[in-house]
Amino acid sequence: MTTTTAVSPDRFKPCLRCPEEGPAVYVACLAAYNAGTLHGKWVDLSAVSKLVFTESGMATVLQQCIDLVLADSPEPGAEEWAIHDTQGLPKVLMGENPDLSELAAFTRQWELACEDSDDDAFRVWCDHIGEVQTYEDFREAYRGSWDSEADFVQDFYEQNGKDLGELSSYIDWEQVWYGEFSCDGWWSEYAGDGVYWVFSS
């Protein structure tokens, strides 16, 4: 990808770092790469988000951060760049030339998810859908974290007024998950540490 914008570095330098966690991209200068030199910097997307109020404004600031990386290149007049590494992004945004507006949109929605400690589940959900989604849409589909799909199904029946009494102990809830829920588009993701995230269709 090519860029030509000239920017003042001071405002955006705090964004040129890799955070301990959260979304970030490594911007590489292709002119330097093709000349046999590695030149690039991490861009902290959350730090970029803090500078502006809108997603479109964030995409503009992100482009200006990229311009700073190129301005500092050992190759004079460098214009082309690519993303050579990422952190905390869904796979759908892991290409060399992601849409900057999509990076901005994901970061803003991820920040909303962080407020409810749903950031990891939100990222997995975007991967499953295959595109960046809103946190509001995520909340409509997300059914929480469970020890197993079977535990979720049993609770689902109980919460919806289906009192099975003693029959509950004879039901294979795992088979109910696969035979009824999974076949109807519900899905789960193993989050580690014995926890499953469950999503509706």
Predicted regions mapped to residue ranges:
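Short, flexible beta-strand-to-coil junctions
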Residues: A28-N34, Q87-G88, Y190-G194, S200-S201
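Residue-level detector of alpha-helical secondary structure
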Residues: C126, R139, Q154-Y157
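Acidic, proline/glycine-rich low-complexity IDRs
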Residues: T4-F12, A150-S201
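Structured domain cores in non-transmembrane regions
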Residues: K50-G130
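Extracellular/secreted glycoprotein ectodomains characterized by long, lumenal stretches
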Residues: E96-D99, R108, D120, F138, ...
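N-terminal ordered "arm"
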Residues: T2-L68
